[in-house]
Each structure stands twice: as structure tokens, then as C-alpha cells.
């Protein structure tokens, strides 16, 4: 019988659905294993061959764990809210819900063809009201919580209100936006609105004024990773920095726990380090600086308190509120012009860019230890969100301060004995202090001269604490997350506004569903798209949405017009997969207790400082409320690499429609243009197909070499815009899903990026055919016999079992595919058709090529799926070699090799080697001085 992959794959995909093969339920008798992929955003382009890489890798592992007897949860869903669907809706007028469903259906069709073991009964879509019910619920919980630093957890906001009513802020140690100081009487005397404004300083979900990346053309705030070179990643529209009142999440309150949690998870060292750097813990001191001729005082944070004697200027972030206060009238025009320029740069660009820019404010601060006046500058190398948004600049011992001082000709004052700062700053935290204070300074006060840097830091901290000039402080780079977007296609906030302050709708009224709007653009008055909704007001009496015309600001109030960002729906989706049809809770306690957290999470490294931070924060918050039993959501994380596209180029001669072949292009002034890889074969362009590809090329002319047009090529990201996308449907149709699955694994290690190249795919397809031929000959005769296997056959099998078991545990799937090929070749050479061997071979191959393995498993007479078989264990006795190959050396130089029985004695080996005629040749009749036998390795004859 011929291997007909199309019929086989279609047959078994239907059987899996009909038999609910991959449906899973909690089973206390089995150990659980939760496998999860970062779910996809369903774009209109569908999947290309790069997308399934991680899915295939995780699916192999999921199937493997099931064969080991684990109860495996392997769900899939869709991150369905997002900017692309909304942009498409703006361009076409088609509702995002329609395009999203169409895209999801296309994704599902493609995923099903590849044969994944997903439990589709647990499918979730973040745009489904039944799903975002629980996103809204979590937001309400965050709004009604504060973070207690003493207990290191979130607590109900009612407890904080009670504490304020009784003691004011006395004795409070809580996470907040700014330090506040008031008595119980002062609190109790405030109006409801005033109290609500104060509570906003403590809530975990709060409204705050933040600097954002604002894109006027898109009418929304963008995340840092959505902005490239000052323009939006999608559409290329200009982006500016702007202060806006936004919903935020107090992620910073969890900074230390996010840092500590990294010690408990199995992630790569590089990814952990990325998160550590993003969280950015630093121990230092806050110091207070007064402004000359003013009663204004401001605070700076420094990790080098020892360098305070070397401060020669101060720098404010352009966004700092101090800029307006400290800019003198003489400097205002220059400062305003500088601020206008910096608005066009994102924080990420400012961090990466080492060019120097700045402007003098006109004001001076006073060094609290020397009483010297210090000029206050403004520069975008200082960020408002880190520390206090103001720094003391010590150019002798900080490279960015040094570059600034050199550029603006400011004083550089070294503080370390023997350091040379003529060409660069001395940043090392080592050496002996000097100039602290400088010679001739008034006596008294802090003296650091002669101390080591470490001693000086400690002494300075003690001094400023004792004198009230500052305090010891641990600072974090991690910022609170901006949580609102001025878009339509996102989760609505369960928020209405009373007297300008936000209030939550009752949890019993969730979900608050996204309303219909006539337009997806901002309103004429600049409101977000939800401003177009005519039925978007909250009736607090009847607890329902009502028409806007009914708003009376007594019982009916306007609803929030912003929507939640893309990461809202992806921050706790792993929990919802556990219990997706529960209408009473995000996840029931019993189900949560069983599945706990994700054992294996697979996704890209690009989410290291976004999704993976937000999910960990979200989970820790829910853990505080007793919702998630595990504090960390993802125990083991594997980052799959990227399958890159192999792009092709044609070269158009400037100002013509003539295209010159690759090796002739240097003779002309040309422009390289991406060309569709589907009309190129082995870098040779199909000329007629190229002319038909796009209207502007219909009259194209060509300068050929040897009658052919040779295209250029490059390995790049697989993308529609580069015309290098390979559709997996084409591969499945031509070779089958099992071939695609194995070939993607064969391309290289899962974690590494590698170019897509179909040159080796025929070899993988031939392997599956050869595997099939162990069961059927060319005439369709069934070959399998129920006879005892030979030692050689069992050796080939058990060598494979050992290799593949180890490889799967290490995600070394590429070497597993090689091992399968070697084993099948060996069994073919041995003409092995023994059921004892082939049955176990099927089980080991099944995670990689499930369709063909199900078919052959069935032919062996099994009545259940191969998924429910048992993973075989290798037997070491079959792996012991009968003979050992020895290298025979003379005076340390290898001359030839000899085979000996594995249990041969050294004396017997020596005698046999010396008697060999080749030894007689190399000894030239001389008696050896010494013969050294290294067991199982080498025989060295010393002459």
C-alpha cells in the first residue's frame, strides 16, 4: 500500500475530532502537565511557515508527556484585540469583529491541517465578552486595592480608608505615587471627591498624568515597542511625547517580588538578565538640593553618594515639573524650543542615543555639603520616570555626564586619587577619595578624603540621614504600566465618571460590552472613538447601559471612553484556559489547585519586557487575592527562534523599467527591489510571471546573463512586505503535515533563528516513505511479523529511544530527526519487520509525525490512539558494544586500528597486536621497550 499522506492526514484529523482525542479534564489520579504557546494575534495574512515553529516544538513535548502518563493541558486561543483590525476597519468600514472572526477561521483551518493536539474545547478569544468579563473583573480588583509594603501584598482599599480615618498617614508604609502627610482629622474633613483624588495616589489601578508616546494620526497612545525612529511601527506616522491623564497599573509596587521570582523559574539566563535590567534595582540615596534665591527644593537619587563633592551641574528631564518653575525669563524661548524638539523622541530612543543635547535653565541649585551654586540644565538623557527626574551630574565619574560637560564646557572635578579624566570619565567604584572636600574648604561637616569608595558611600549615607539632608533609598527602573488606549477595538473599562472622578460598575453587571459606533476614528472634538457611541452611559439605579441623552449626573453618568491596551487580555489568559466555561469565577479554586501554573511556556524573546513582565505582575496580584495558587505563572520558558525568509531581489536601472541581472548590476546605477519568492526558482526569475505580477512591470525589459535573470538574495525576517512569505498550506499540500512538522524541527535548534530553505524537505519526506516501507512493500504487501527481534534490531531501537528521550527533554529536536533517519536506515538494512521493534518505533516517532504513526499503529491491530500508548524505556543491555575499536600507536603516533571483544584481557590484546604483521613492519624487528594498553581506547607500543 502506497503512503498517501493526504488521505491519512485527513482521516486522522477527523477521527481526533470525533473521538475528542485531545480533550482533557482534571484527573486527580494523574500528574498534570500544562503546556502553553503564546497565543497568536489573528492577522489577515494568516500563518506563514515561521509561525508554527514554536507550536510544533511544544506539541511534540505535549504528546511526549502524555505518552509518559501525564494529564496534559495543551490549549489554544486568540489574542483578538489589536490595532491592525481597527486600522483595517477605518480603511474599509468593515467592523473589526467581522474581520477578526474571518481571520480566526483562517488560522483555525491552517492550524488543524498541521495536526496539533490542542484541546479546542478550551479555546478563548480576548474579544469575547465572556472572556473579557474577567479582565474587567481583575481591573476592578486592582482599583479597589492598594499595596502594603510591610505585608508585601495587595490589600483591600477599604483597609487603607479605615487607617486614614483613624490615624491619617502616620505609620503607613504603602506603595504610592508621591509621599503624603495628613492627619485623621484632615482626612475626615475632606469631601468625597478630595478623598477619591488622594486614594488615586495609592490604588493599584489609578488615573495619573504620564508621559506617553502620542500618535496624532492614529489618535492613540503607543507602547515603546510600537514606535521605531520616532514614527509608529504601523503606518509610519509621527509620534510625539505628551503628558496625558491615563489609566495606569502600579506595577512598580511589585518590583522586588518580580525580581525575587526570577530565582524560582527555569528561564534562560539571558532572559532573566533582560528582566533584571528592565526592573533595574539600585541601592542609593535621595538627597535634597535647594534652589538659589528661591524656596524651591528638589530631590535627586544617586547610587554614588560618595561623589557629591564632584557635582558641577544638575540636569532635569525635559518632562519634569521643575522645568517650568526653574526656567528664567531670559532662557524661556531657548528652553521652549528644546522641549519642542525632545517631544519627538521616545524614551527608548533617548536611552539608546548617545548624542549630546541640552539647554541651561537659568537657575542654580545649592550643593548641600559645600554650599556652592550649581547650574541647572535640561537634557533628554535624563528620564522623568526614573528616580526623581533630576540628577546631580558628576562628570569625572559618569560617562554621560562627562560627554555633556565636554560638549558644554562645564567643570570636571575628579574625586579619586590617580584617576585620569582628560579623555574619559573614571566610572569604576574603586580607589581612594580626594577633593572631598577640596583643599581650602571650611572645616567641619563630612570628610571623605583617604577613604575607599565603598567606605565613602557608606559614610555619606549615614551623614545625610543623620543631618536630614536625605535618606537611604532602593530605587527601581521599572515604571508603572500605562493601561489605556484611545482606540475602539479593545476591552471597555468598567468605569463611569461622577463629579469628574472614576467609579466602578458592580461586578455583578459584568461584562460591560463594547458598544457599536458609527466611526472608528476619534471624534471631531478629539475624544476616543467610543465618543461616537450614542448608548454609552451608566444607570446606577437600574445597573445597565443607557442612552447618552439620559445622562443627568445624579443617577446616570458617562462611561469611560478609553479602552484597555493589547496586553490586558493576554495577562491572565493562562488561568482562563484552566476553566474557560466557568461563569462564576476566573478559575475555580479546585481547578486552580490542580493545574497550578504553566509547566512549559513557548514564545518569542520579544515579549521579555512587555507581556512577560505584565503577566507576572498580574498573576502576583491575583495570588495576593487567593485567586492563583502559584505566584509565578510560567515555570519553564523556551524561546523559539525565528524562521527567517530567504528574500529575492531584482535590480532596476535608475529612471528606467529595465532590470539587470545580479552579476551585471555593478555596471549600472540600480535600485534593489524585493520580488515575490514564488516566481523565483533557485534564484532564477520567471520573467513572464514577473511581468504578470504587478501592472508596473508589464512592460519590463531585462539585461540577462547566459539567457537567465539571476536574482540577488538575503536572509531576512519573513514578512508580506518583503514578499518572502511561505504559506504552510502549500507545504502540507505538497508533502504533508508530518513532513512539515519534522522538517521545521530538522532546520536547527528550536531556540535559534534559521532561514527557511526547502532544499532539505525532500529528504525528510523520503524518510517518512522509508519508515512506511518497513510496514508495506512496493506492491502493498503487509510486511510486519510477530517474531522475536534480533540483537542488532533491538540495539538500533534502544539506541534511538535513549537518544530521542534525551533530545526531547533538551528540546534538541533537530538531532532527534537525524536519529530517526539513522535508525530507519539501520532497520531497513537489517530488513527488520518485527512487530516488537516497529510498535515501539511508532510510539517514539508519534510526537513528531502523529498522522502516519496513528495509521501504522492502527494497522498493528491497536484499538486506541497511539497518544494513549506508553513511552518506551531503553534497556542498557542492548546498548553495550560487543567489540571495541582500538587505535594502535607506535611511539605515540597512530598507525592503524584493530577490533577486539569488549571483554578482552589486556594481555590477550597485547599479544594479538604484537603478532599482527603491521606491527612487525613498524617495530622493524626490534623488541618493544614497553606496551601500554588503555582499556577500550588505545594500545601504544614504545620502541
From Swiss-Prot:
The UniProt catalytic activity note for this protein reads: tRNA(Leu) + L-leucine + ATP = L-leucyl-tRNA(Leu) + AMP + diphosphate
Q: Which UniProt keywords apply?
A: Aminoacyl-tRNA synthetase, ATP-binding, Cytoplasm, Ligase, Nucleotide-binding, Protein biosynthesis
Q: Which GO terms describe its molecular function?
A: aminoacyl-tRNA deacylase activity; ATP binding; leucine-tRNA ligase activity
Give the Enzyme Commission number: 6.1.1.4
Please name the CDD domains in this protein's record.
Answer: Anticodon_Ia_Leu_BEm
Query: Would you say which domain of life the source belongs to?
Result: Bacteria
InterPro entries named among the record's database cross-references: aa-tRNA-synth_I_CS, Leu-tRNA-ligase, Leu_tRNA-synth_edit, M/V/L/I-tRNA-synth_anticd-bd, Methionyl/Leucyl_tRNA_Synth, Rossmann-like_a/b/a_fold, tRNAsynth_Ia_anticodon-bd, Val/Leu/Ile-tRNA-synth_edit
Q: Where is this motif: 'KMSKS' region?
A: 717-721
Q: Which GO terms describe its biological process?
A: leucyl-tRNA aminoacylation
Q: Name one GO cellular component term.
A: cytosol
Where is this chain primarily localised? cytoplasm
Q: Report the locations given in the UniProt record.
A: Cytoplasm
Q: Which cysteines are joined by disulfide bonds?
A: none
Q: What class of enzyme is it?
A: ligase
Q: Which residues bind ATP?
A: 720
**PROSITE patterns per record:** AA_TRNA_LIGASE_I (PS00178)
Chain location of the short sequence motif 'HIGH' region per the record:
40-51
Q: Family per UniProt?
A: Belongs to the class-I aminoacyl-tRNA synthetase family.
| Protein name listed in UniProt | Leucine--tRNA ligase
Originating species: Bacteroides fragilis (strain YCH46)
> What lineage does the source organism belong to?
Bacteria, Pseudomonadati, Bacteroidota, Bacteroidia, Bacteroidales
Amino acid at each position: 500500500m502506497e503512503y498517501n499522506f493526504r488521505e491519512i492526514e485527513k482521516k486522522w484529523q477527523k477521527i481526533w475530532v470525533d473521538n475528542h482525542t485531545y480533550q482533557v479534564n482534571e484527573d486527580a489520579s494523574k500528574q498534570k502537565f500544562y503546556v502553553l504557546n503564546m497565543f497568536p494575534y489573528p492577522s489577515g495574512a494568516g500563518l506563514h511557515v515561521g509561525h508554527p515553529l514554536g507550536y510544533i516544538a511544544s506539541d511534540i513535548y505535549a504528546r511526549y508527556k502524555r505518552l509518559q502518563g501525564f494529564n496534559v493541558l495543551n490549549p489554544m486561543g486568540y489574542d483578538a484585540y489589536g490595532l491592525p483590525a481597527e486600522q483595517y476597519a477605518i480603511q474599509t468600514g468593515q467592523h473589526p469583529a467581522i474581520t477578526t472572526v474571518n481571520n480566526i477561521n483562517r488560522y483555525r483551518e491552517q492550524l488543524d491541517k498541521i495536526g496539533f493536539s490542542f484541546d479546542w474545547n478550551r479555546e478563548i478569544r480576548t474579544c469575547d465578552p465572556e472572556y473579557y468579563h474577567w479582565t474587567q473583573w481583575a481591573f476592578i480588583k486592582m482599583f479597589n486595592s492598594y499595596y502594603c509594603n510591610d505585608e508585601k501584598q495587595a490589600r483591600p482599599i477599604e483597609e487603607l480608608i479605615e487607617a486614614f480615618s483613624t490615624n491619617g498617614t502616620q505609620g503607613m508604609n504603602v506603595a504610592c505615587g508621591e509621599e503624603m502627610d495628613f492627619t485623621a482629622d484632615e482626612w475626615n474633613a475632606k469631601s468625597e471627591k478630595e478623598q477619591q483624588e488622594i486614594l488615586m495616589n495609592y490604588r493599584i489601578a489609578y488615573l495619573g498624568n504620564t508621559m506617553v508616546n502620542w500618535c496624532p494620526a492614529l489618535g492613540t497612545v503607543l507602547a515603546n515597542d510600537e514606535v521605531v525612529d520616532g514614527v509608529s511601527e504601523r503606518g509610519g506616522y509621527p509620534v510625539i511625547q505628551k503628558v496625558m491623564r491615563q489609566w495606569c497599573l502600579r506595577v512598580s509596587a511589585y518590583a522586588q517580588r518580580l525580581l525575587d521570582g526570577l530565582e524560582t523559574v527555569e528561564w534562560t539566563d539571558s532572559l532573566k538578565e533582560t528582566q533584571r535590567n528592565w526592573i533595574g534595582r539600585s541601592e542609593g540615596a535621595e538627597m535634597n538640593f535647594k534652589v538659589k534665591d528661591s524656596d524651591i527644593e528638589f530631590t535627586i537619587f544617586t547610587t554614588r553618594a560618595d561623589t557629591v563633592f564632584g557635582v558641577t551641574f544638575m540636569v532635569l528631564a525635559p518632562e519634569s515639573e521643575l522645568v517650568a518653575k526653574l526656567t528664567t525669563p531670559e532662557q524661556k524661548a531657548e528652553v521652549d524650543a528644546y522641549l519642542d524638539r525632545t517631544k519627538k523622541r521616545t524614551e527608548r530612543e533617548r536611552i539608546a542615543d548617545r548624542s549630546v543635547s541640552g539647554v541651561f535653565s537659568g537657575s542654580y541649585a545649592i550643593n548641600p555639603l559645600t554650599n556652592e551654586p550649581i547650574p541647572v540644565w535640561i537634557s533628554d538623557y535624563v528620564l522623568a520616570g526614573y528616580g526623581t527626574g533630576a540628577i546631580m551630574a558628576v562628570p569625572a565619574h559618569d560617562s554621560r555626564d562627562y560627554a555633556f560637560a565636554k560638549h558644554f564646557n562645564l567643570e570636571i572635578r575628579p574625586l579619586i586619587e590617580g584617576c585620569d579624566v582628560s579623555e574619559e570619565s573614571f566610572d569604576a567604584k574603586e580607589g581612594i577619595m580626594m577633593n572631598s572636600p577640596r583643599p581650602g574648604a571650611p572645616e567641619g561637616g563630612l570628610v571623605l578624603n583617604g577613604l575607599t569608595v565603598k567606605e565613602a558611600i557608606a559614610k555619606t549615607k549615614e551623614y545625610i540621614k543623620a543631618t536630614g539632608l536625605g535618606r537611604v533609598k532602593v530605587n527601581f527602573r521599572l515604571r508603572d504600566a500605562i493601561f489605556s488606549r484611545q482606540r475602539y477595538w479593545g476591552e471597555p473599562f468598567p468605569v463611569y465618571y461622577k463629579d469628574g472622578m472614576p467609579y466602578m460598575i458592580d461586578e455583578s453587571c459584568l461584562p460591560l460590552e463594547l458598544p457599536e459606533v458609527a466611526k472608528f476614528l476619534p471624534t471631531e472634538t478629539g475624544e476616543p472613538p467610543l465618543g461616537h457611541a450614542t448608548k454609552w452611559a451608566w444607570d446606577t439605579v437600574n445597573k445597565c447601559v443607557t442612552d447618552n441623552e439620559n445622562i443627568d449626573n445624579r443617577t446616570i453618568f458617562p462611561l469611560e471612553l478609553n479602552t484597555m491596551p493589547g496586553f490586558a487580555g493576554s495577562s491572565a489568559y493562562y488561568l482562563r484556559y484552566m476553566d474557560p466555561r466557568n461563569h462564576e469565577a476566573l478559575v475555580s479554586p479546585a481547578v486552580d489547585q490542580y493545574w497550578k501554573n504553566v509547566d512549559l511556556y513557548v514564545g518569542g524573546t520579544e515579549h521579555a519586557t512587555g507581556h512577560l513582565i505584565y503577566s507576572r505582575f498580574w498573576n502576583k496580584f491575583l495570588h495576593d487575592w487567593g485567586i492563583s495558587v502559584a505566584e509565578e505563572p510560567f515555570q519553564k520558558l523556551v524561546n523559539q527562534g525565528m524562521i527567517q525568509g530567504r528574500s529575492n531581489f531584482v535590480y532596476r536601472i535608475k529612471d528606467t523599467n529595465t532590470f539587470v541581472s545580479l552579476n551585471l548590476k555593478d555596471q549600472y546605477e540600480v535600485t534593489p527591489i524585493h520580488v515575490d519568492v514564488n516566481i523565483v526558482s533557485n534564484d532564477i526569475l520567471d520573467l513572464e510571471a514577473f511581468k504578470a505580477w504587478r501592472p508596473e512591470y508589464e512592460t519590463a525589459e531585462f539585461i540577462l546573463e547566459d539567457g537567465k535573470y539571476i536574482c540577488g538574495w538575503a536572509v531576512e525576517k519573513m514578512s508580506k512586505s518583503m514578499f518572502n512569505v511561505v504559506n504552510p498550506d502549500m507545504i502540507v499540500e505538497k508533502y504533508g503535515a508530518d513532513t512539515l512538522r519534522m522538517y521545521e524541527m530538522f532546520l536547527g535548534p528550536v531556540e535559534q533563528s534559521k532561514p527557511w530553505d526547502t532544499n532539505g524537505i525532500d529528504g525528510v519526506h523520503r524518510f517518512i516513505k522509508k519508515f512506511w516501507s518497513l510496514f508495506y512493500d512496493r506492491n502493498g504487501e503487509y510486511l510486519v511479523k510477530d517474531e522475536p527481534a534480533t540483537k542488532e534490531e533491538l540495539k538500533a531501537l534502544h539506541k534511538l529511544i535513549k537518544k530521542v528521550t534525551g533530545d526531547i527533554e533538551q528540546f534538541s529536536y533537530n538531532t532527534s530527526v537525524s536519529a530517526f533517519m539513522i535508525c530507519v536506515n539501520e532497520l531497513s538494512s537489517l530488513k527488520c519487520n518485527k512487530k516488537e521493534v516497529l510498535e515501539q518505533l511508532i510510539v517514539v516517532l508519534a510526537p513528531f509525525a502523529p498522522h502516519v504513526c496513528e495509521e501504522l499503529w492502527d494497522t498493528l491491530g491497536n484499538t486506541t490512539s497511539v497518544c494513549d500508548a506508553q513511552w518506551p524505556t531503553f534497556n542498557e543491555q542492548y546498548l553495550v558494544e560487543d567489540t571495541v575499536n582500538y587505535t594502535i600507536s607506535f611511539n605515540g603516533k597512530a598507525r592503524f586500528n584493530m577490533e577486539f571483544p569488549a571483554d578482552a584481557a589486556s594481555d590477550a590484546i597485547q599479544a594479538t597486536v604484537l603478532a599482527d604483521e603491521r606491527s612487525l613492519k613498524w617495530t622493524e624487528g626490534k623488541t618493544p621497550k614497553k606496551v601500554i594498553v588503555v582499556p577500550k581506547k588505545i594500545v601504544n607500543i614504545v620502541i
